[in-house]
């Protein structure tokens, strides 16, 4: 076993945690259905090489921008972003995401006005916004688990900054346009009264 996911209601003894830890198995305390990660018992990494490299790249503004450009190049493979500033990169990404929303809305015939998200009122959003929120939370949980398992820091982001999950958002953004956005619109298109987001 490489990782043990412990969900709500799990009861585990100190001795069991000790034995599991001795085997090198990671333990992750997760939310319902394994979506959110709340704590990690042990990283899969046995060295600090990733976090040291990450800290070096984040701490130098020139290197940080170079990494951000590479991340954006993954999203815009046909565009030259080599001379763009961080502000220009962020603006380009915003335009691209709005275009993806519009295209998915047309593809699935789902009404779309804008992204609306209130963390205190999930049910208050329309179906497509609820589906986007749920899909993104699942993606964040997956990315978070991988980042900490590899021994990198969730908070040392290159594009996103100032949040304890900045790097999680950076990585998740690489995949949203191909994964969570199309999935959310497909779910919204097929949603019925008896379904649960």
Describe the residue ranges of each PLM region.
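Active-site helix-to-loop segments that bind/position phosphate- or nucleotide-bearing substrates
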Residues: 36-197
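Glycine/small-residue-rich interface belts in oligomeric ring/scaffold proteins
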Residues: 2-48
């Amino acid at each position: 076993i490489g990782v043990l996911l412990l969900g709500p209601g799990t009861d585990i003894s100190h001795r069991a945690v000790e034995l599991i830890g001795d085997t090198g198995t990671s333990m992750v305390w997760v939310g319902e259905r394994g979506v959110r990660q709340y704590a990690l018992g042990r990283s899969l990494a046995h060295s600090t090489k990733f976090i040291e490299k990450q800290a070096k790249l984040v701490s130098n503004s020139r290197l940080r921008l170079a990494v951000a450009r590479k991340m954006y190049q993954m999203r815009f493979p046909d565009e030259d972003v080599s001379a763009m500033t961080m502000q220009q990169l962020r603006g380009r990404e915003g335009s691209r995401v709005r275009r993806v929303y519009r295209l998915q809305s047309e593809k699935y015939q789902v009404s779309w006005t804008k992204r609306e998200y209130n963390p205190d009122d999930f049910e208050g959003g329309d179906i497509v916004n609820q589906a986007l929120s749920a899909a993104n939370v699942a993606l964040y949980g997956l990315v978070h688990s991988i980042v900490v398992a590899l021994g990198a820091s969730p908070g040392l982001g290159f594009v996103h900054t100032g949040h304890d999950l900045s790097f999680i958002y950076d990585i998740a953004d690489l995949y949203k346009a191909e994964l969570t956005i199309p999935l959310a619109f497909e779910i919204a298109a097929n949603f019925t009264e008896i379904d649960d987001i």
